[in-house]
Amino acid sequence: MASPKEILVVNGREVAVSNPGKIYFPQAGYTKLDLVRYFLAVADGAVLGVRGRPMALKRFVDGAESEPFFQKRAPDNRPPWMRIATLTFPSGRTADEIVVDDAAGLAWVANLGCLDLNPHPVRAEDLDHPDELRVDLDPVPGVPWSQIRDVAMVVRESLASVGLVGWPKTSGSRGIHINVRIEPRWTYPEVRRAALALARDVERRAPTLATSKWWKEERHGVFLDYNQNAKDRTVASAYSVRPLPDARVSFPLRWDEVPLAVAEDFTLATVPAIYASRGDAGAGIDAAVGSLDALLEVSARDEAAGLGDAPWPPNYAKQDGEPPRVQPSRARRPAAEYEPGMGVDGGPPPDVAAERAAAVAAGDPNAGLPPMPGLPEGWQGTRPTPTGRRRSSIPVIEIARAASKREVQTGFERWCLRHPEAAAHLEPADVLTDAMRGRSSAWYRLRVNLMHVPESLRPTQEELDPDYDPWAAITPEERAAWEAAQAALGGRRPAPRSRPDD
């Protein structure tokens, strides 16, 4: 028996809604048809955020509580009036992506299970020059909402100082987004460079509230994710619905609303009435086009002062001028910080290597090494054999890998039960949950920073629980082909993140 459908006529075009009664938000009781009707109620504002922009389809086909999959290639059975644009990804591959231009297109993608819409910051007519700089305020765990709002106001000041206008909106999740309309005459790397300069300027203005540090283990407060402006990165657009139990919405705000705004106030149920009564707070964005020249001058001053590039996302080829792409907890420490006798690769410093080798051969195992603390001068004995291992400056261990966030959090709960004394010392920011990028879907890992745990209580690295392998369903031939493609583009390994390359 065929699944029931509801046919909607939107701007003279028929859009079929399959399984209209399917529950998408179990706790709130909202159905797929409710989702489609919501988007139609805010269509002018929602289309403004995506019009003319290619987008990947993030599909929650079994509702908000299911794991989404990302479909970059436009479905073959799309309606003839749905536009596409051909994008080239960092991997070198291409795909025809959907371009939504009107309310009918909005309803059509909603029927596919797209709760949040993820357009690129470029228009289909010019895929190499973004016309939008995106500021993503991403709080570390435990940061209060009030602090995120405070940082947003600092961003406004920083933008104004370089002649730019920001358009804020709640992310619908934990943060705030601020979009900046710019002239489409800069490349992706140049826009990212400007975003990094902005992040650093905000950090200078509010050093206790904000950070531009890429590595999670170094962050505090609210992170300004400058890498959201790298090519192929996207953020949820205005009026997107997020996969949370209350069907929260990414809602545009006026600047005078930001200091008192509460993210939970904006949901699938409440936003249509708010929108009907006050309109779209972001409606003027296309009339506020700005230049990046002044912000790029800030970047040039930073670089002249020795503040160069910052790390790129792991799936990008190594960039000119980029610092080593190594987590601080895994970085090799300067020679002066090594323990006595721990030279490069586990040997002594090169200038005494030959002397020490000769002395050891002559029967003195401690030749060339300083006395061990607490032992009398001239003591002869044996020292532990150097292992060549680095001593991490930040003690981070990995707890779990899984296909869903819920599974890694459950694994972390089991770890806490095994190590209650260590768990008692953890702060919210010490628990690092990362959305990783698989070949065709997202997966998750959870790590713990033990910096606040006394050394005597720090557990060692254990087997992961659970230990998910994102490649388990991939044939050896497919994996080899994928790795070869990454190696050809800068020696990269498969580096999962939250969205696939192809």
Predicted features along the sequence, with ranges:
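Short secondary-structure junctions
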Residues: L48-V50, L159-V165, A206, P420-L426
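Acidic/polar low-complexity segments and flexible, solvent-exposed patches
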Residues: Y338-D502
